[in-house]
């Protein structure tokens, strides 16, 4: 299963490192990544391959990063993401 992870917050050192390290520890492959900084606002979208990983466990760990770094992080199934953003 593929999932989309979005991260938004004040730009600070280590955001990409924290998220990608957690994904690495769960053997989750990053298929695509887009990251932009607009003034002090950091935004990132990742497409990941969740094969063998439990969405709930990953969401829980992302919530920990979200709280620790004062970010907004969301994860959802790629199919749901695409359905919600179809014009």
State what each model feature region is:
Residues 1-87:
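A conserved regulatory-domain signal marking ACT and ACT-like small-molecule sensing domains
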